[in-house]
Every structure is written in C-alpha cells, then in structure tokens.
Amino acid sequence: MGCRDVHAATVLSFLCGIASVAGLFAGTLLPNWRKLRLITFNRNEKNLTVYTGLWVKCARYDGSSDCLMYDTTWYSSVDQLDLRVLQFALPLSMLIAMGALLLCLIGMCNTAFRSSVPNIKLAKCLVNSAGCHLVAGLLFFLAGTVSLSPSIWVIFYNIHLNKKFEPVFSFDYAVYVTIASAGGLFMTSLILFIWYCTCKSLPSPFWQPLYSHPPSMHTYSQPYSARSRLSAIEIDIPVVSHTT
C-alpha cells in the first residue's frame, strides 16, 4: 500500500486514538482514583473503604458491593488539589484528542475519495492529507501530555497525604487506566510522525505540511477568461492583409 493511498499506519493510528479517548472517558467517570481505608479493631464491625473519584464518592464495607454512602455532589466540594486539576485536565485532553481524530478522518477521507483529475474551481478548497495527519500527531502529543502529567501527580500526592495524615491513602486502578490511555495517545502521535517522516521523502509537494497544489495542477492552463484582459499585442492574433 503506497503512501498516496490510505496507509495501514494512518488507520492504525486512528483506531489507537479512538481506544485512547475511550480509555480517558472511562478513567474520567470511574470512582476509583483514591482509596481511604479505615480499619477497625472491633471484631463486631467491618472495615470501611472510601472510594474517591473525580465526580462521586462511595463508601462501602469490606465484602459488600453496595455503597453505604454515595455522594453525587462530590465534584463541587473536592478538597484534594490533584483531583480538582484532573477535573479540568482530562476533559480538555479528550477535547484535544477528538479534534485530532477529526483531522485524521478528514485526511483519510480526502486520500480515499480525491479525484485524480483536480477541479480548478475548487483549487483553493483542496485538503492536504499529509498536513492533516501531521497536525493530528501534534494534537495527540499535546493531549497525552495534558492527561499524563496530573495522573502521575496523583501518585506523588498520595505520598504527601500519607505523610500529612496517616498511611491510609492509596491510589486505585483509574490511575492506571488514564496513564495507559495517555500512553496510547503518545503511541498514536509516534505512528503518525513516523508515517509522515517516511513518506515525505517522495519528490512531491503533496507531503508538505501546508497547502500546495498537486503536481497535476501545474499541467492545466488557465481558462481563456483569465487571459482575456491581455492586450492585442500580447495575444497572438493573426493579421490578414489584402494585396491589390
């Protein structure tokens, strides 16, 4: 499959981007970012674990699947700085990644359905597929950075909480889901960069990141209406003379 066709690398990056955005969405909604485990020494009582998410909080006894306390207004009263930052960082990261997916889709559709004979009237509306993929790679990298940094901060903030209070705090599996999704965004960006750097060595302006006419556009002459403003001297008009 040539670089001028819909390449397997671009399809793989698109699917990887979708999976990464889905992982970020799941990590954003999961109520399993931090656990607060309260241990009792009374044999007649059970240990209590408080699961803290970005939007809700749930407290349940050990061995129970039902929440003893389910706080749906937790998102407005979050008192932990790392979770408050994640409330803004993860939706922003998903928004950037979805913009990158849209650019990837535009680039692939333009590559798959473009005509081999360009329409001169639509010359200013042509889409540069390589440029779309290049910008999408940059956006994927930005989205991964926005989501990865605060997710790793949760790990170090747990250490701070355990030192400040008691060693009862631990991070939960939503941290792993988000870090893995951010890694998927970085891998998507890397695939697009490798694809672009491999294909741009072709001697064609098609691989320039900015808009440029395809090579076949230069073989077309301008319509006569664009030349009609030339003077009679510039236009080669045959002159017929009559001899007596």
Swiss-Prot record:
MF term (GO), any: identical protein binding
Keywords: Cell junction, Cell membrane, Membrane, Phosphoprotein, Tight junction, Transmembrane, Transmembrane helix
All ranges on the Cytoplasmic side of the membrane: 1-10, 109-135, 196-244
Phosphoserine: residues carrying this PTM: 228, 231
Subcellular location: Cell junction, Tight junction; Cell membrane
PROSITE patterns: CLAUDIN
GO cellular component terms listed in the entry, alphabetical order: bicellular tight junction; lateral plasma membrane; plasma membrane
Membrane topology term: Multi-pass membrane protein
Primary location class: other
GO biological process: calcium-independent cell-cell adhesion via plasma membrane cell-adhesion molecules; maintenance of blood-brain barrier
Transmembrane segments: 11-31, 88-108, 136-156, 175-195
Topological region Extracellular: 32-87, 157-174
Subunit text: Interacts with OCLN.
Family membership noted in the UniProt record: Belongs to the claudin family.
UniProt function note: Plays a major role in tight junction-specific obliteration of the intercellular space, through calcium-independent cell-adhesion activity.
UniProt-recorded name of the protein: Claudin-12
